[in-house]
From Swiss-Prot:
Regions crossing the membrane: none
EC number: 5.3.1.6
Pfam families for the chain: Rib_5-P_isom_A
Subunit structure: Homodimer.
Organism: Protochlamydia amoebophila (strain UWE25)
Reaction it catalyzes: aldehydo-D-ribose 5-phosphate = D-ribulose 5-phosphate
Pathway: Carbohydrate degradation; pentose phosphate pathway; D-ribose 5-phosphate from D-ribulose 5-phosphate (non-oxidative stage): step 1/1
The gene coding this protein: rpiA
UniProt record similarity statement: Belongs to the ribose 5-phosphate isomerase family.
Gene Ontology terms describing biological process: D-ribose metabolic process; pentose-phosphate shunt, non-oxidative branch
Taxonomic lineage from the root: Bacteria, Pseudomonadati, Chlamydiota, Chlamydiia, Parachlamydiales
Annotated protein name in UniProt: Ribose-5-phosphate isomerase A
A cellular component term, taken from the record's GO annotations: cytosol
Length: 232
């Protein structure tokens, strides 16, 4: 993981990811998040496993699972896990109360389930993800494919502006759970993320939102100069 030719942004992500690996100990059951920063974490964790670290892990996405297996991290079936020791995941935005927007990578439902099943969730970010208030980044909302157009219409009728996520070929994006994502764009910063989450979840067909709260433990911030800071 040489940093010689890395951009400042990549240097920040790698710095945070490498620091996070230090918190993983032998015999732990680890939850693996999804995203660009977590990809660096998985790469570094794989090297520790190759050097003798004994852990097991579950992944929040097929993408993270494939990468983990490729670098030698033992992956177990999520159905066998009652509790995880630690989840390492990123965020699209995080505020001073450790409320987050997640889901840019499309794995919000599994990410929230894994975090909820963990003794601690360590959030790994670069400095650009720090915000005073959430809302500049779209809020991913996972919705059922059954009557999905009605669900989207209902959300729009109640003032939620956004669009269904699509692939590069403009086909509708499907999550690993087989659902669609409606990305909601808030016109102003979100004053009460918990209220918005609960309101969205009250609509039939809304399975999960990318608003995360009461889940983050320590936060590892990577900076473009290669330094890190840990917020307890």
């Amino acid at each position: 993981m040489t940093q010689t030719n890395d951009s400042p942004s990549i240097k920040a992500k790698k710095a945070a990811a490498l620091k996070a690996v230090e918190f993983v100990q032998d015999q732990m059951i680890i939850g693996l998040g999804t995203g660009s920063t977590i990809a660096y974490f998985i790469e570094a964790l794989g090297k520790r496993c190759q050097a003798g670290l004994k852990i097991t892990a579950i992944a929040s996405s097929e993408r993270s699972m494939r990468q983990a297996r490729l670098v030698g991290i033992p992956i177990v079936d999520s159905d066998t896990i009652l509790e995880l020791d630690l989840t390492i995941d990123g965020a699209d935005e995080i505020d001073p109360l450790k409320q987050m927007i997640k889901g840019g990578g499309g794995a919000l439902l599994r990410e929230k389930l894994i975090a909820s099943a963990s003794k601690e969730m360590i959030v790994v970010i670069d400095e650009t993800k720090l915000v005073n208030k959430l809302g500049k980044f779209p809020v991913a909302t996972e919705i059922s494919i059954f009557t999905f157009r009605h669900i989207v219409k209902k959300l729009k009728d109640h003032g939620y502006c956004g669009s269904l996520r699509v692939n590069q070929d403009q086909s509708l994006y499907r999550t690993d759970n087989g659902n669609y994502i409606f990305d909601i764009c808030f016109p102003e910063p979100i004053d009460n993320p918990i209220f918005e989450h609960n309101r969205l979840k009250s609509f039939a067909g809304v399975l999960e939102t990318g608003l995360f709260f009461n889940l983050a433990g320590r936060v590892i911030i990577g900076y473009q100069n290669g330094m890190t800071k840990i917020v307890a």
